[in-house]
Amino acid sequence: MASVLLALFLLSFVLGRYDVPLAQLLKILLSGIFPIEQTWTDNMAIAVLNVRLPRVLLACLVGCALSAAGTGYQTVFQNPMAAPDILGASSGACTGAALAILTGQSSVMITVFAFGFSLLSVALVYLVGSHARGSRVMNLLLAGIMVGSLFSACTSYIKLVADPTNQLPEITYWLMGSLSGTRMSTVTFAAVCMAVGLVPLLLLRWRMNLLTLSADEARAMGIHTDRLRLAVILSATVLTAAAVSVSGMIGWVGLVIPHLSRRIVGNDCRRLLPMACLFGAAFLLLVDNMARSLTATEIPIGILTAFVGAPFFIYLMVKGGDRL
């Protein structure tokens, strides 16, 4: 999978309206490390380093984050339909971004608002779920549905009162998900936030298999599953918040990719989580290449992931629903 990701990584730099030969591409990318004589034009360097490199890196980061978050949530809740938006993180991010656009904030503040509201949404879910009676897992799922619906209603109201000429189209486009106009500052923000969520998740993957045990079995082994579950939820939430805040709503990646990864390496989280990260990065990179190459006008990436992910998930259900 790493070789596939590398091939797609290089292919992404070649695709585009401005032609950059592969030989020149490699020289441009390596010129920052090695002293290479310049044989490329300044326009080639701008296209590769300022336009395509940030976008390619962000596609890899977002795909990796969403897939890792989906794997974490599916393991915690023991639910094959669990996705990164199960606790309302995506709905909260949408409300934050829509509010920032409505109030005329800069692109940086749109990302900050989306990230903050995403964390706020999950905090409310955990607050409600932990104080309700009954099963902790079921309470979190129900609270996620309710809080997500509340934030979705807030987003709908913001769209209703937004200026239909300028603000509403911008809100709508953000909600459809896109990686266009990515800057290195955005990539840096995403990388730092995602590292905060991904590193603990990778360190915990040896223990995540224990979440499949019953409460009595875990207690007999002296394992605090509540603490482990909370740590995984927090890590997956930070990953989801970071991904959605910089890319908008991109669905199906965190739902489909973990299932495909299980088909390849099995259910052991020690191998499953790294595979999901690589697979997710490669998948979103491929879809982003399609988004900017299929038509003259760029297609929002959230639309393409739905077109690709939904039919493929149906195929998985038909061919082996008992293995989902």
Regions found by a protein language model. Give the residues of each.
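Alpha-helical transmembrane segments in inner-membrane proteins
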Residues: 1-324
